[in-house]
């Protein structure tokens, strides 16, 4: 059944951030068992998103006044990151898609007018799947004004995750004056062209991140979200990296769990070298888990939660988020190598899950500008005469 026709779940009006996190925790094993069935080019975890809808998780990032659980609000960052981690532990492709849904809901609640927020919140409550399609190549999206106040889209987006299944993508496009404008496109009313042959990836095959040609589609002025340039407003643009890092930590946890299961199954738990590797892997997993809590606490530190866009707070929040994504990337890469050595060639054969987990996490770790992110954290440390005991706390 298409996501856009799903009925609202009664659970979504009963949830709190704690119960939303608990729902994701409960779903993780089912997501993991189901993951192989959508792991093919052109696949999509349709059934899994039905489960998320039934659990109220598609509406959970909405404010409580809009019928959600408030999971997307600043004081609930740790519950949100934990929810993303649990979903990523179940299936990284589902985690990637859900993170995009969360991002879109946060963006329209932050930058939308009251009437727009109510309209798009109703769509989320009705089961529509949102996403964010920003990446583009040379033929990027342009907005052409029409005489009737509408706009015609020209151009394409690459990596349109959930293409063909996301019914409310949040897009960005260039206005004639060069401004970068957000919009939310109602895809149950008109369809773009999907280039499915574009998506032949190493991993994350089930995310259906096709190239999307939007040329010729028209939108109303009411579909525009916020002012030009709002999409890149800090700290939210770069600071949002903590969300995908949380999903990545979940993927690392899945690899850890499967490694210990495999070693128990083959009777290698007494091997001193396996124990040493598991000790190293435990250290890495704990590091990722501690960083999730640290990231949430940093966002809520005095002043930053109430005045996040003040330059002094925004700059620090972005630098800390860049630290987190860098640490998580490093620990995941190290953990992947340790897991490979633990399970050997035998463990990398299907139907063991390591081959899929390795592909998915390796691919998902390739986020934009990793070197620049770490360099920015170093720049921040050099630009501010703050002692180490206060710099990142």
Give the label of every model feature segment.
Residues 1-79:
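A generic N-terminal leader/anchor concept
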Residues 27-30, 251-258, 284, 291, ...:
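Amphipathic, well-ordered alpha-helical segments in soluble domains
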Residues 32-40, 264, 287-327, 340-348:
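C-terminal helix-coil-helix/basic helical segment that borders enzyme active sites and/or dimer interfaces
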Residues 44-54, 58-161:
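Glycine-rich flavin
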Residues 159-194:
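A short core secondary-structure module
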Residues 201-286:
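Glycine-rich beta->alpha junctions and the first turn(s) of the following alpha-helix
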Residues 250, 279-286, 322, 326-333, ...:
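Generic structural signal for well-ordered, non-transmembrane alpha-helical segments
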Residues 345-393:
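Glycine-rich phosphate/cofactor-binding loops in nucleotide/flavin-utilizing enzymes
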